Amino acid sequence: MELIFLGTSAGVPTRSRNVTAILLHLQHPTQPGVWLFDCGEGTQHQMLNTAFHPGKLERIFISHLHGDHLFGLPGLLCSRSMAGNPHPLTVYGPQGVREFIATTLRLSGSWTDFPLQIEEVSAGDILDDGLRKVTAFRLEHPLECYGYRVVEHDKPGALNARALKAAGVTPGPLFQALKAGKTVTLADGRQINGADYLAPAVAGKSVAIFGDTAPCEAALALAQGVDVMVHETTLDASMEEKANSRGHSSTRQTATLAREAAVGRLIMTHISSRYDDKGCQRLLAECRAIFPATELAYDFSVFPV
């Protein structure tokens, strides 16, 4: 998996940062895909600067209904429809996202020509496509808001072909069954258990993508042990009280969460427009002082998971 940041500003766009949107590129060898997390104003325009377009999207996850996370959605849906893309799309989000989509399309005389499914979520598992699971966590914000934890299923370990050949098993259909951990019977009557010839399973990658939030109990469960945590750092440590009063987090709080959750890496985003490049570097330094494995996202930054 890899993350492509389309917008990294909080509240309003700036000359260098658009409002929130993040692509998750699912780099599976046989079932690749592209998911979008939040869709602030101008998201479809930002996508023009990437290798992806709205037609490639399979799923969109909306954290909450504030405009800087949502107002780009109607235009993106309409453009996807105008392009003649027939592939289905599912939108996940809090209560009200269905009404928002229906109302904006109706009042603007617009529609979608592709199958559009809308799922209003609550805390808990919301998706398992056989390759990965998505769990929603309710966060602390003035509007109903969720963060999403995406965890790949573990991959089977490599098959020890050399040992199987030494045991008299020839490559072919039997190898496929053994790779699946099944027991096969050879022509001479011997039974071979595939599990005995498999290396340990390879742990799937995991990422936690937060919506806007002040510190809360659910945040630790959402982030616990993930390879990558994407979290807002709206304001610096000196403005912590103001951040919390508006349902946001400071640099200090975000970095402390990353440390307590033992994540592999923290990626900062949702930066207040009050900070210029120098100010952003100060935010980064505040986080790294607590959690060194921190990166600052810019628009079009790409990070592997």
Curated annotation (Swiss-Prot):
It comes from the Bacteria. Its cofactor is Zn(2+). It holds the Pfam family Lactamase_B_2. Zn(2+) 2 binds at residues 68-69, 212, 270. Belongs to the RNase Z family. RNase BN subfamily. NCBIfam families: PRK00055.1-1 (NF000800), PRK00055.1-3 (NF000801), RNase_Z (TIGR02651), true_RNase_BN (TIGR02649). Zinc phosphodiesterase, which has both exoribonuclease and endoribonuclease activities. This is Ribonuclease BN. It comes from Salmonella gallinarum (strain 287/91 / NCTC 13346). The gene is rbn.
